Amino acid sequence: MDIRILKDKNNALLNRRELDFIVKYEGSTPSRNDVRNKLAAMLNAPLELVVVQRLKTEYGMQEGKGYAKIYENADRMKDVELEYVLKRNVAPGMETEGEEA
C-alpha cells in the first residue's frame, strides 16, 4: 500500500491538520485502520489522534481517494468529531471497557 498526500492544510481554529490523499494498493481495499496506521507512521503522528473521515474507491481501480484529520490533542478531537466517526476509527477489539461492541 502506497499513500501520496495531495493536500496538507493546517487548521489552527480546530487544532488539526487536514489531509487529502490517494492510496494505491493491490488486492482488496485496505481497511480504514490500515490506512490510519500508515498515515500515522508516515507523518510521525500518534495513532489515536488520526481520524480517517473518508475513503472512496472506484470500481476496478486499485486506488482510492481519502480525507483524514490529525488532531493536536484528544480533548479537541472528542469535542469536534461526531461519535460515529470516532467509532469507525477504532480498531476492532480496542474499544474501551465501558463500551459495548
Curated annotation (Swiss-Prot):
Protein name, as recorded: Small ribosomal subunit protein eS24
Xref: PANTHER family: 40S RIBOSOMAL PROTEIN S24
GO molecular function ontology, one term from the record: structural constituent of ribosome
TM region(s), chain numbering: none
BP GO terms, sorted: translation
Alphabetized HAMAP family for the sequence: Ribosomal_eS24 (MF_00545)
Family membership noted in the UniProt record: Belongs to the eukaryotic ribosomal protein eS24 family.
Pfam families, alphabetized: Ribosomal_S24e (PF01282)
This protein's GO CC annotations: ribonucleoprotein complex; ribosome
Coiled coil location: none
Alphabetical keyword list: Ribonucleoprotein, Ribosomal protein
UniProt keyword annotation of Ribonucleoprotein present: yes
